[in-house]
Amino acid sequence: MTKYALVGDVGGTNARLALCDIASGEISQAKTYSGLDYPSLEAVVRVYLDEHSVNVEDGCIAIACPITGDWVAMTNHTWAFSIAEMKKNLGFSHLEIINDFTAVSMAIPMLKKEHLIQFGGGEPVDGKPIAVYGAGTGLGVAHLVHVDKRWISLPGEGGHVDFAPNSEEEAMILEILRAEIGHVSAERVLSGPGLVNLYRAIVKSDNRLPENLRPKDITERALADSCIDCRRALSLFCVIMGRFGGDLALTMGTFGGVYIAGGIVPRFLEFFKASGFRGGFEDKGRFKDYVHGIPVYLIVHDNPGLLGSGAHLRQTLGHIL
């Protein structure tokens, strides 16, 4: 008889839950719930389990916030809870709450070739470190290493490192944003809101007044080639995305590959392919040759967070991935 575990991927807006076959890692019965409709994460889990008439003893839920102890307070939501108390209330034997990019990194060993699009470089080197990052509401970063038949995710808040301009234009953008918001992290330019920041700074650098645009508006106008400022912002986004990925590659020697996740890049895939992304990735001066062969992949799996939550839990329970 198939034994299932509960897996989840929770962001500031929605909670996506599913079942994971503990033996195979296969994900099924995925369903998305609006976080605004429920008073707590526990309430959502109970509704899901009732709807699917399934008894589970184990669970792993990825959440878009730092996980530093038993108490979890979501960054972009009002939900807050004790992991131990939630585990007890649900009657689970195991309940893991992990960072969302920990989950994405743990999905990488489970991905197949059809789940990836490669952007330059050669073949990944087995046993070498891996980096994963992605732009969405924010900028998530994690690394992954393989030690003694176990995958170990190294989470962090790499999206909040300093934005490092590498041209006169970018230096001007930094100056404008710094005057507005103070500290300018990489996330302030590599995210949905970051794309808006780039657009606004580009327009203001020319002493003009920017329109009140959403990330979606900027992308659509850039792809339609109907707004030169929007197109420049999206082009710059791709280049900076490349340089940031190259920074991750240098920091950990990620000859196992660099992986891009998140919901933004797939929305303009053809534009991204033709952009200066790879040039930005390899623009490392004396260390260009060092990163030249490192492959970069875009993850196109529908639910890497759920897949990785399942992989993390299965490994915790003693399975070899």
Swiss-Prot record:
Q: Which Pfam families does the annotation name?
A: Glucokinase
Q: Does the keyword Kinase apply?
A: yes
Which transformation does this protein catalyse, written as a reaction? Answer: D-glucose + ATP = D-glucose 6-phosphate + ADP + H(+)
**CDD domains linked to this entry:** ASKHA_NBD_GLK
Keywords, alphabetical: ATP-binding, Cytoplasm, Glycolysis, Kinase, Nucleotide-binding, Transferase
Task: List, in alphabetical order, the Gene Ontology terms for molecular function in this entry.
Answer: ATP binding; D-glucose binding; glucokinase activity
User: Top-level EC class, please?
Assistant: transferase
Q: Which InterPro entries match?
A: ATPase_NBD (IPR043129), Bacterial_glucokinase (IPR050201), Glucokinase (IPR003836)
Q: Could you state one GO biological process linked to this protein? A: glycolytic process
Quote the record's binding site residues for ATP. 8-13
Tell me where in or outside the cell this protein is found.
Answer: Cytoplasm
Please state the protein's primary subcellular location: cytoplasm
Q: Does the keyword Cytoplasm apply?
A: yes
In short, the EC number is 2.7.1.2
Q: Does the entry annotate any disulfide bonds, and if so which pairs?
A: none
Q: Name one GO cellular component term.
A: cytosol
Q: Tell me its family.
A: Belongs to the bacterial glucokinase family.
UniProt xrefs under HAMAP family: Glucokinase
Per its UniProt record, what PANTHER family does this chain match? GLUCOKINASE
| The protein's name | Glucokinase
Write the gene name: glk
